[in-house]
């Protein structure tokens, strides 16, 4: 974009995405400058629980595509509904009870457990995140949108 090269990265631990980062370079052979996390409003800093796959340009706009290996534990965090689907909610509550955590009192830790429950993962159900990549002062930014148009 604008003659600059952007790099969107993350890692994985099991099937859980790790924090993501964006970097920029005028010349990729001379290295990149890290810009930090690109997802705004994502407490996990993991591009909304996805791993960057690619960015494509469509009609002058850039679209972020990310793999999401654990959709059953992720989507509910960004829809405004504070609860996952009933089956997932039951699995999470069982795990919290096993760990001696109260979902209200230990909310932050409970969210971490819910997000990181690899044993609830069925990767054949993996899905994707498609979001418009926005720009603020030469910096790529992702914001969760339940619905959007080109």
Q: What spans do the regions from the language model cover?
A:
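Carbohydrate-active catalytic/glycan-binding domains of CAZyme proteins
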Residues: 1-150
